[in-house]
Each structure stands twice: as C-alpha cells, then as structure tokens.
Amino acid sequence: MVHFTAEEKSTILSLWGKVNVEEAGGEALGRLLVVYPWTQRFFDSFGNLSSASAIMGNPKVKAHGKKVLTSFGEAVKNLDNLKPAFAKLSELHCDKLHVDPENFKLLGNVMVIILATHFGKEFTPDVQAAWQKLVSGVATALAHKYH
C-alpha cells in the first residue's frame, strides 16, 4: 500500500485541480500509443493508428484518454485506498482485456511527462516525486488482480 504524506496529498490535489483532463488525457494516451507502438493492439477498434499525427488527432484516442485520466481523478479522491478504488478496473483489464500490467507503468510515466510539459516550472521536483508515487501506486493497484 502506498502511503502519502499530508504534503504529498496537498501537492497532488493542488495540481489536479488545474489539469485539463480532456487535453492531458488524450495527449497521454496518444503518446503511449506512439512511443510504445505495441500497446496499439489493445485499441484495434480505434481506426487509423498508422502514424503519430493520425494517433494524436484520432477522436477515439482523445475520448478514451479523457476516460483514462478521469479515472485518475478517482485515485486523487482515494489516495489512502488505491487498491479498492481500482479493483473493478483491475479485474476488467486482467480478465476481459488481458492488458499486460507493465503497460500501466508506461502510461503512468507518460502522464508524468505530460504534466511536466503542461505545468513547466510549476512541476517542481517535489511535485514530480508526489505524482510519480501516485502513478506508481495506481499501476500497482491496477495490476492487483494479476497477482
């Protein structure tokens, strides 16, 4: 279980309140699909994923990215209970979608990069550390059903 200090919680909540979920979510999922092309196999129904520009402009990628980042809102609301908060998503990704749990870590790392690009100097090393801890905790919670 991940333990967040009061300062880390405050840092996460403060930044989360400024995140444009639609924009950042689409960009994060899009980058995941571009940088790690083998992850595209889980998105066969999304249509054209033939190039970086096709992926980044794909409305299905943007919509699902928003959905993914919205689920991170659940993490922000449940910092002390990540595993229960992601139990159903863990089951879905394990039993029905058969997603390699390593992909959760990759997406988390991409999300940290997106946040850094969106927030620039505001994304200090302390902010990065708190968010890295969060995305790692979410990846672990999502992988829970696999164990």
UniProtKB/Swiss-Prot annotation:
One example GO MF annotation: organic acid binding
Residues at which heme b binds: 64, 93
One Gene Ontology biological process: hydrogen peroxide catabolic process
Domain Globin residues, every copy: 3-147
Pfam families: Globin
Entry keyword Metal-binding: yes
Any one GO CC term of the record: blood microparticle
Keyword terms of this UniProt record: Heme, Iron, Metal-binding, Oxygen transport, Phosphoprotein, Transport
Key word Heme present: yes
Tissue note: Red blood cells.
Source superkingdom: Eukaryota
InterPro entries, alphabetized: Globin, Globin-like_sf, Globin/Proto, Hemoglobin_b, Hemoglobin_oxygen_transport
Modified residues (Phosphoserine): 14, 51
Assembly behavior: Heterotetramer of two alpha chains and two epsilon chains in early embryonic hemoglobin Gower-2; two zeta chains and two epsilon chains in early embryonic hemoglobin Gower-1.
Similarity comment: family membership: Belongs to the globin family.
Task performed by this protein: The epsilon chain is a beta-type chain of early mammalian embryonic hemoglobin.
Record-given protein name: Hemoglobin subunit epsilon
Protein species of origin: Microcebus murinus (Gray mouse lemur)
